[in-house]
Amino acid sequence: MSTQQTAVRAIIFDLGNVLLPFDHGKMTQQLAAVLQADPSELATFLFGPDEWFLKLENGDFPLDEAHRRLCERFADCSLDAFANAGGDIFVYDEPMHRLTRTLKELGLRLVLLSNTSALHIDYVRRTYNTLEPFDELTLSYQVQASKPDSAIYRHAIGQAGCEATECLFIDDRADNIAGAEAVGLRSHLFRGIGELLPWLRSQGVAV
């Protein structure tokens, strides 16, 4: 006897390397240029044992304070130069944007769930139309929790306005998929739109 699959009412998407490919190496090089810093020294500062960049994404300090701290550590630059150098790390993905628009037209609720900072989400907002189809944004620096912490998934489910079993979750990291499945989300490890579309259809989404 087959069991009936719960109908999908909402889809929760990751941002980086799902909706928009990105490159932290590009960010490091560009920030190094405006801060007059050695790229390897800056990379260690951002991503080394102190986890400075993870703290920024987790909302431990705001963007203007991040700018001040980096200028104190390296060299002065304007906030605009800092924001552009740090934010310009994405590549626009038109097929994924078309997909999210289609899903929205199907009547599904769309939620973005991203470990991100104001540095990156503000750049995406002012540069691309990627976020237009989304009903809600669950952003780590605002929630002050990051994937795979269960708290941020539960926040996104709340924004979806339905049960976890009625949501799908899409992310490019296996640890984030495991965290999502632990709270009851049907999840897909993203490896490109070519694998995503058949999975969505297998979940009853007519794309």
Question: PLM ranges: what are they?
Answer:
Residues 26-30, 51, 65, 69, ...:
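Alpha-helical elements of Rossmann-like donor-binding domains used by nucleotide-donor carbohydrate transfer enzymes
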Residues 109-111, 186:
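Proline-centered loop/turn at the N-terminus of a beta-strand
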Residues 14-17, 59, 103, 112, ...:
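Generic structural signal for small/hydrophobic residues in well-ordered secondary structure
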Residues 4-98, 105, 117:
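N-terminal helical cap/lid subdomain that shapes the substrate entry/recognition surface
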Residues 2-9, 13, 117-207:
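Asp-based, Mg2+/Mn2+-dependent phosphohydrolase catalytic module
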